[in-house]
């Protein structure tokens, strides 16, 4: 018989219904549903009494829960070498698989089911990470647009500076030629005019140089911000969400 199962379907089958992470020390209740041992303990505090299954609500004997060996074998067979251990909740020691939209923090399944985040809107970490990556891409696009504007401003300032310097050279040449035709009595007037045009030019050039320096500084800061955003995109889901949320709150 041929079997065809998608990766998403397989991932759903291997997830604990409580913590929404891959089973760890899976136990099967008498009703047939399986959960992480840690999740069942957190739910009922111990397994020596009756346990109400969170899926079918059937009350079963917790002490009769047996390890789901077949499921553990499947998970172990599919686990990649060197897979990092997931970050866990400090309260329940379960994987941080959810993101509380109200409190803007990472939580585990039990935090959302029974803890302080009960009834809060929550989203799977992978979905939040995808959403934040989209926001990061939009921010990156805005950054590129700002860089383009700064580059255009710098090009315009450089062009204006060159034009003013060239025009100043032409005016100076015209003035020199005109004054060469005059006699000595007008030499002082010639010098005064040249100094005037020179001072005016220096003032304009100094102003443009200052604007150029400011624009180039802005471009460098935008480039640094671009580098930081690119580095955020390479972080793992949890580090990325923590750092992105920290940056956005500022």
Curated annotation (Swiss-Prot):
A Pfam cross-reference name: zf-B_box
Keyword Coiled coil part of the UniProt annotation: yes
Keyword Hydrolase annotated: no
Keywords: Coiled coil, Metal-binding, Zinc, Zinc-finger
Zinc finger (RING-type): 16-57
GO biological process: innate immune response
Residues engaged in binding Zn(2+): 89, 92, 111, 117
Matches recorded under SMART domains: BBOX (SM00336), RING (SM00184)
SUPFAM superfamilies to which the protein is assigned, alphabetical: B-box zinc-binding domain, RING/U-box
PROSITE patterns: ZF_BBOX, ZF_RING_1, ZF_RING_2
Gene3D superfamilies: Classic Zinc Finger, Zinc/RING finger domain, C3HC4 (zinc finger)
Listed GO CC annotations: cytoplasm; cytosol
GO molecular function: ubiquitin protein ligase activity; zinc ion binding
Zinc fingers (B box-type) by residue: 84-125
Domain of life: Eukaryota
Family indicated by similarity: Belongs to the TRIM/RBCC family.
Identification of the protein by name: Tripartite motif-containing protein 74
Species the sequence originates in: Homo sapiens
Gene name of the record: TRIM74
